[in-house]
Each structure stands twice: as structure tokens, then as C-alpha cells.
Amino acid sequence: MKNLKMKKEFKVIADLLPHNSRVLDVGCGDGSLMDLLKKKKNIEVRGLELNQDNVQQCIHKGLPVIQGNAETELHQFPDQSFDFVVLSQTLQAFYKPEKVLKDLLRIGKSVIISIPNFGYWKVRAKLLFFGEMPVTKTLPNTWYNTPNLHMCTIKDLFNFCDEKNIIIKKVVGVNENKTSLIKKRNLEIKNLFSKLGIFLIG
């Protein structure tokens, strides 16, 4: 099921990107998304990844990748050097997510961010009825070994963009194998029933 969710997320991200664009994938993991974008959309893609094993997998696939920490390495990229910057389910793991977002918006003409939605109804129910930090398919780690430092909801990210005058171009909610557009008028209900939020901002 996790692979299905990941494939759906990557398909949504790929659909947001035009053919032949230049993309930086921050926290690119093993390069699965980069590989998809390169093969399906002829995208010139580069990755930034901290984990050495993931970097080796990217290299093995013939994908251009730099090993480094996004919180300390993004300043090296010139302004507007990519058409898009992608950050997939990583924002919540940074110590200073606002600073990272500022760098992404500086580096890319547009930015695509996906987040696990802490406002999903099953997450809320776990906290409400059991009084425990939730463990779900999109939040698979227990509280004591999770990489997540700053959990947020789809609504939180909407509000953040409003406060910082960041233009929201499109938001897609993902739930299992279904997707739906999220607007301000349906934000409350989509925040409740979407496991994942994918934002196109810039």
C-alpha cells in the first residue's frame, strides 16, 4: 500500500511538471521520482540527498545527485536556477522549515511540496480517543523514533502561505488511490479526508 501511495504521489507531482523543464529534487531518496520524471517527461533533473546509501542508489541509476544537507547546502544554489524545486514529504523533518522554504522559493521559479496531513481524520481520532501519537501509513514511525519535527496539516500550510504572501497555484489532496483539488472553499473537508497534501507554490 505504501508503494501505491508513493506512486500516486509521484504521478501527481509528474503531472504538475511540464516536459523538458529543469527540476531540483530536494531529499530525493533513492531517486525514484527523478527516474520517473527523466523517463516520462524528459525532465532535466538533479537531486540533493543526505543519506549515503540513497546517493549510491541514485548514482547506480545514472542520476545526477549531490550529497548534502538541505538545511545547510541550499545556499550554494543560484537564484532561479531551476524551473521547479520538489520537496516530497520532507518539510516536517527540518529544524527550520521556514528557512528551507525561503531557499526553495529563491532557487526555483515554482516549488512543489508534499506533506503527510496531520489533520487527517484517522490521525485526529487516534489522538482524541486513545490519547496517543498516531501511527499510520503516512506517519509510520512511533513518537520516539520519528524523523518528523514539525508536523502540520494541509490547512496549516495554506495559512502559512497566506501569512507569508506566498502564492498558492494549486493544491491536490491524495487519499489512497484518489486525488482531488483543494480550494479555500472546500479546505475544511479536504483537510479532514486527505492523507497527503501536494502544493504548487511560487
What are these regions, as identified by a protein language model?
Residues L4-N20:
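Conserved alpha-helix/loop element of class I SAM-dependent methyltransferases that forms part
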Residues E98-D103, S110-G202:
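S-adenosyl-L-methionine-dependent methyltransferase catalytic module, highlighting the catalytic core
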Residues H19, Q80-S81, I107:
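Alpha-helix C-terminal capping/helix-to-coil transition sites in glycosyltransferase folds
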Residues G27-G29:
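Class I SAM-dependent methyltransferase "Motif I" SAM/SAH-binding loop
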Residues F84-K96:
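A short SAM/SAH-binding and catalytic strip from SAM-dependent methyltransferases
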Residues S32, L36-E73:
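Class I SAM-dependent methyltransferase SAM/SAH-binding core
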Residues E73-D79:
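Short conserved loop adjoining the S-adenosyl-L-methionine
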